[in-house]
Amino acid sequence: CRNGGHFLRILPDGTVDGTKDRSDQHIQLQLSAESIGEVYIKSTETGQFLAMDTDGLLYGSQTPNEECLFLERIEENHYNTYTSKKYAEKNWFVGLKKNGSSKLGP
């Protein structure tokens, strides 16, 4: 979960962003498979699940729901990409901007 040197993190208030700090306790994420190619991404520090809402905004959810399930794909360049399963028709990816803020799905 890196982009431009940023690690994806889920903060206690549900904010999702990126940090360059490797020692930040909120970058520790656990992936768990729901089925082949479908994963939940959970912060081991806050216990929150990564989620994407109807507008493509990333947030942390205390409980897993439809917005927390992502389709995982290994690309030709060997990077993993994650798209919202619920909004798959919109082709929204999990992403960070170069400044570390979360990028809207579209």
UniProtKB/Swiss-Prot annotation:
InterPro entries: Fibroblast_GF_fam, IL1/FGF
GO annotations of cellular component type: cell cortex; cytosol; extracellular region; extracellular space; nucleus
Cited Pfam families: FGF (PF00167)
Molecular function per GO: fibroblast growth factor receptor binding; growth factor activity; heparin binding; integrin binding; S100 protein binding
Keyword NADP: no
Biological process (GO), any one: positive regulation of endothelial cell migration
Keywords for the protein's UniProt record, in alphabetical order: Angiogenesis, Cytoplasm, Developmental protein, Differentiation, Growth factor, Heparin-binding, Mitogen, Nucleus, Phosphoprotein, Secreted
Record-listed heparin binding positions: T83, S84, K85, K86
SUPFAM superfamilies the UniProt entry points to: Cytokine
PTM section of the record: In the nucleus, phosphorylated by PKC/PRKCD.
Superkingdom, natural source: Eukaryota
Subcellular location: Secreted; Cytoplasm; Cytoplasm, Cell cortex; Cytoplasm, Cytosol
Role description: Plays an important role in the regulation of cell survival, cell division, angiogenesis, cell differentiation and cell migration. Functions as a potent mitogen in vitro. Acts as a ligand for FGFR1 and integrins. Binds to FGFR1 in the presence of heparin leading to FGFR1 dimerization and activation via sequential autophosphorylation on tyrosine residues which act as docking sites for interacting proteins, leading to the activation of several signaling cascades. Binds to integrin ITGAV:ITGB3.
Family: Belongs to the heparin-binding growth factors family.
Subunit structure: Monomer. Homodimer. Interacts with FGFR1, FGFR2, FGFR3 and FGFR4. Affinity between fibroblast growth factors (FGFs) and their receptors is increased by heparan sulfate glycosaminoglycans that function as coreceptors. Found in a complex with FGFBP1, FGF1 and FGF2. Interacts with FGFBP1. Part of a Cu(2+)-dependent multiprotein aggregate containing FGF1, S100A13 and SYT1. Interacts with SYT1. Interacts with S100A13. Interacts with LRRC59. Interacts with CSNKA, CSNKB and FIBP. While binding with LRRC59, CSNKA and FIBP seem mutually exclusive, CSNKB and FIBP may cooperatively interact with FGF1.
The protein, known as: Fibroblast growth factor 1
Organism lineage string: Eukaryota, Metazoa, Chordata, Craniata, Vertebrata
